[in-house]
């Protein structure tokens, strides 16, 4: 008779462990969900601007990033793409950082601001980081106050 009586608890513990590991694997496979869009998309050209319209409730929904090997991050890239200024949102396996820079491509007569925002929670690449903007505002208010006193 299987399992033997003395191995009953060990057998149930092993079965429980296998079920637990399988359920954890399923959670890990689901991965991060990010907004994935591009302003150069001709079917829906206005769904992927720098800011989502309609009070930040976008027409698109975050997508599962399981098709990107090792995806752990969502990225929002704002800059000049294919002749126009716009945004791209995508899944990434690399932390690309958070920074802005001025870029001049070959043939350009001026510099264009290009920004990268990287985050690691579901749907976090909807907008840029507000902390940076609030920090700049606080610094300007402090400077204004100091100059007046």
From Swiss-Prot:
The keyword Protein biosynthesis does not apply. GPI-anchored. Residues 126-149 form a propeptide. Residues 148-149 are cytoplasmic. A lipid is attached at residue 125 (GPI-anchor amidated asparagine). Coiled coil: none annotated. Disulfide bonds join 34-74, 37-48, 65-91, 100-115, 119-124. Residues 1-31 form the signal peptide. InterPro entries: QVR-like, Sleep_regulator. Glycans are attached at residue 64. One of its GO terms (cellular component) is side of membrane. It comes from the Eukaryota. Its main location: membrane. Residues 32-126 are extracellular. It is a lipid-anchor; GPI-anchor. One of its GO terms (biological process) is regulation of synaptic transmission, cholinergic. The chain crosses the membrane at residues 127-147. Keywords: Cell junction, Cell membrane, Cytoplasm, Disulfide bond, Glycoprotein, GPI-anchor, Lipoprotein, Membrane, Secreted, Signal, Transmembrane, Transmembrane helix. It is found in: Cell membrane; Cell junction, Septate junction; Cytoplasm, Cell cortex; Secreted. PANTHER family: ATILLA, ISOFORM B-RELATED-RELATED, BOUDIN-RELATED. 'Boudin' is an Anglo-Norman word meaning 'sausage' (specifically blood sausage) or 'entrails'. Mutant larvae exhibit developmental defects resulting in an abnormal tracheal network structure with the dorsal trunk adopting bulging cysts resembling a string of sausages. The C-terminal transmembrane domain, directly involved in membrane association or indirectly through facilitating GPI-anchorage, is required for autonomous activity in cells expressing bou/boudin and non-autonomous activity on remote tissues. This region is required for exit from the endoplasmic reticulum. Involved in tracheal paracellular barrier functions mediated by epithelial cell septate junctions. Involved in paracellular barrier functions mediated by glial cell septate junctions in the peripheral nervous system, including the chordotonal organs, but not the hemolymph-brain barrier (the insect blood-brain barrier) of the central nervous system. Required for septate junction assembly, possibly by organizing the preassembly and transport of septate junction proteins such as dlg1/disks large 1, Nrx-IV/Neurexin-IV and the claudin protein kune. This is UPAR/Ly6 domain-containing protein bou. The gene is bou.
């Amino acid at each position: 008779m299987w399992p033997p009586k003395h191995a009953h608890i060990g057998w149930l513990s092993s079965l429980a462990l296998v079920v637990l590991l399988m359920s954890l694997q399923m959670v890990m496979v689901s991965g991060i969900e990010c907004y994935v869009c591009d302003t150069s998309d001709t079917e829906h050209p206005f769904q992927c601007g720098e800011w989502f319209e309609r009070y930040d409730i976008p027409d698109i929904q975050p997508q599962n990033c399981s098709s990107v090997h090792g995806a752990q991050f969502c990225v929002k890239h704002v800059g000049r793409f294919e002749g126009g200024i716009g945004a791209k949102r995508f899944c990434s396996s690399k932390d690309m950082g958070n920074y802005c820079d001025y870029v001049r491509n070959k043939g350009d007569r001026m510099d264009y601001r290009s920004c990268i925002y990287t985050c690691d929670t579901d749907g976090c690449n909807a907008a840029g980081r507000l902390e940076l903007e609030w920090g700049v505002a606080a610094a300007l208010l402090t400077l204004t106050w100091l100059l007046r006193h």
